[in-house]
Amino acid sequence: MATNLMTPDPSRQSPHWDQPRPPVAELQMNPTTTGRVLLAWRRQQLAGQPRSPADLQPSLDWLLDLGAGVGRQQLQLLQLSPDQPVALQRSLDELAALWNRHLGEAVPLQYLLGLCPWRNLTLQVGPGVLIPRPETELLIELALQLVPSPPQLWADLGTGSGALALALARAWPHSRGLAVELSAAARTVAAVNLRVAPHVQLLSGSWWQPLAPWWGQLGLVVANPPYIPTSVWAQLEPGVREHEPALALAAGDDGLEAIRQIAAGAVVALRPGGRLLLEHHHDQSEAAFELLANAGLVALARHRDLEGVWRFASAQAPPNDAR
């Protein structure tokens, strides 16, 4: 995961992309206002804050999109036609209360709304489960590049909200997936998100242990494990440090405890030639490479994130005759 929680970006795919809009009769039961009132409310929420309106506006517009059903394009149209009526999914008072909690207590908006747009999905999230980051979407793209033919069996270690598992399930609807999670709170959320993927089995436990019945059969394993060093913890922004689960973030003095365990079990768990693909901290590329190589994995490669940082590592289990 990233060290900091990314500001929600309203320019990304609408969170309602796969959900039909409510019928007109339902919309009429929702709070209504006019564009003029809504735009004035928006300016009021941005005014008088320690941070500049330019810094806060993306988050507020994201709240309006996901929490009220008013997307960025509609906001732009209301600038031209401010007297147009606007149906809201929440009242302005409710939205203001959420916004004030976000500003005053650093509670992530994703937790306040219980939803997080990620890739082309809308995931349920909540306290106790890590909020999926945009850069982790690249794990899916890398997996599809490195494993062009769907494997019979794949696994997601530390699935959290189930984001990676659900994305792979949609990409490979005829493959079987195994999603492992230690946290009971996260498993509860993942179970909800994975209801639409019946070919993914959710398992309780830590890393490789729940997968013992399938050791030697896994064609691909992906993982976004905790990798924050103890020394970095105090530097995390409050929304991360005070609200997101330490179990999904912290990984000992060097930040490599989880990656060390994943590397150690990979050769046994992967089928010959099976791939491991994981995310790591921005300065852990060399250390992760060393752990993977020492574990007996081959075909090591590193991959950059959207900012050009070495963020991901991939490797393969050796063929049968090399084990």
Regions found by a protein language model. Name each.
Residues 138-235:
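Conserved SAM/SAH cofactor-binding pocket of Class I
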Residues 143, 168, 240, 262-266:
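Class I S-adenosylmethionine-dependent transferase superfamily signal
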